[in-house]
Amino acid sequence: MADHEVYDAIIKLPIGKKPCTLTVVRNGDGTFDGEFTVLGSTAPVTNGKIDEEGNYTADCTITTILGTLEATTEGRIYDGKIDGVAKSRMGVMPIKSEELW
């Protein structure tokens, strides 16, 4: 298995701030695969792109107690932290490492 990076974070959902995890597996060509976990559900991260400064974009479709949600995400991964947003029909939801809140 390729090396993977795990980022524990907080996402601000309409129901409040909730813990989440993003797992990233860099493919070495500016793309990445991964998983996103929130509210006890895990889903694959698709179309992941990341540059040398850690700026990323990706897509995710996850089914939780809130229903099925399609989102595009963008932000930056740096110094072991994540600072980004997920954009979906529920609005823009910040995703940040706990120390960035």
Predicted regions located by residue number:
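Central antiparallel beta-sheet cores of small beta-barrel/beta-sandwich binding domains
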Residues: 1-79, 83-101
